[in-house]
Amino acid sequence: MGNAADALGNADMLRLENLDTDIAPPKAAIEATLAAVTRDDANSYLPFLGIHSLRDAAAKRFTASTGIDCDPEAQCIVSAGGLSGVLNCLLAILEPGDEVIISDPAYAGLINRIRLAGGVPKFVPLLVVGGRWRLDLDALRDAASAKTRAILTMSPSMPSGIVHTAEEWAVIADVAERCDAWILHDAAMERILFTGAPVIHPASLPGMAERVITVGSVSKEYRMIGWRVGWIIGPKSIMNDIGLVSLTNVVCQVGIGMPGAAAALSAEQDGVAEATREWEARRDLILKELHDIPVVAPDGGWSLLIDTQTLGMSPGEASQKLFDKGAIAEAGENLPGKTH
């Protein structure tokens, strides 16, 4: 549908299929990026693993979320966006045929990168309980096997907006420990919460600090989609392998983007809390407008799902009807999981 909308060239169409935002990035990030454009050191292949100021800022951000000390030189490398970081991690930890547990539905970009790295996604469905998304914990336990190499988590997750509870995290940690598997955690939206509850980071759970690899990004919380800057933080035991993959896969990061990302992570006024309040208000408005339609309220993030089958039509049919009325929404049939 996005391609069809592009072909029409109608600027008045309401584009709901892509996760963009109109809330501006932090002012400090824009200023630092503009300054970097004129500097020789920002127009270089070096340093291959990312500038120190960004690695240091990302390490401090990780410590603030987890309470765990992080050595920026030994435990943090910069990636060309969050998804590039996820792929680098998967390439470092997977052998062909290894299984990666992931919730269903999940963002197609994550699922496809599991497959690109030679892994096999094992889908664990989300359930609707009390009007909210919940992880099927019995299915999670059943998905574990001798081939399980990793559990790929995201909270809030795309496209459902599920925010994992303490109980869900405890079971995820138990399964990871039982399978001797990594938890690969996409933390791109971890503070975009509408629940009022504190962030639960899996690395902060008992015994998980040496089992969790965290991928961060400035795209969502900091509204810096076009910068294509992320970072990876993990135990020293795996970071050398991830660094070698990064050097082979991407070589270097976005030189003029990294100073802006470092400024965003270090800014006293990063705008995340204000942006989250605005996103929550928009969510509430959408839920109010769609009160007669079966929408499961997201507890965080940038997206929500509508159960079109209760309206007597498939996701594709509903997407086409919206398109005909000038709105673009992604059909669940296009997601590579099993839940549509």
Task: Indicate where each model-derived feature is located.
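PLP-dependent class I/II
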Residues: 7-14, 19-36, 63-340
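Glycine-rich loop-to-alpha-helix module at the N-terminal edge of alpha/beta enzyme cores
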Residues: 16, 39-44, 57-60, 64
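Short beta-strand to alpha-helix junction loop
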Residues: 49-50
